[in-house]
């Protein structure tokens, strides 16, 4: 699945922001706008035993240009919340369910 970071209208959002994948399915987060974005998983809102640091971008790393991507495979079933650290306060958050 491809998830866009930033709407075509300039909105600070993940599109889609709530979706499901199969365990091990590749998720491609793609910068859709000229704003710097990243993808950080919330260590308190992922399945127990999953290391948020291994699935998240470093908070200092940013996808600066349109078309830049971050890819991740989630293998543990459950619910994962994530956010863009520069824009979390603006509501740029999302959730993926791994089945």
Curated annotation (Swiss-Prot):
Cofactor list: Cu(2+)
Residue ranges constituting the Plastocyanin-like domain according to the UniProt record: 1-99
> Which cellular compartments is it found in?
Plastid, Chloroplast thylakoid membrane
Is Plastid one of the keywords UniProt gives this record?
yes
**Which stretches are annotated as coiled coil?**
none
Kindly state which keywords UniProt assigns to this record, in alphabetical order. Chloroplast, Copper, Electron transport, Membrane, Metal-binding, Plastid, Thylakoid, Transport
- PROSITE patterns named in the record: COPPER_BLUE (PS00196)
Q: What does this protein do?
A: Participates in electron transfer between P700 and the cytochrome b6-f complex in photosystem I.
Spell out the family assignment given in the record's similarity comment: Belongs to the plastocyanin family.
Could you identify this protein by its name? Answer: Plastocyanin
Q: Which gene encodes it?
A: PETE
């Amino acid at each position: 699945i491809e998830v866009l970071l930033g709407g075509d209208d300039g909105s600070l959002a993940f599109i889609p922001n709530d979706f499901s994948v199969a365990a091990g399915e590749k998720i491609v987060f793609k910068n859709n706008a000229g704003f710097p974005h990243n993808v950080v998983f919330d260590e308190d809102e992922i399945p127990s035993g999953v290391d948020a640091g291994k699935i998240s971008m470093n908070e200092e790393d940013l996808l600066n240009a349109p078309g830049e991507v971050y890819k991740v495979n989630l293998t543990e079933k459950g619910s994962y919340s994530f956010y863009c650290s520069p824009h979390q306060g603006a509501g740029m958050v999302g959730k993926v369910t791994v089945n």
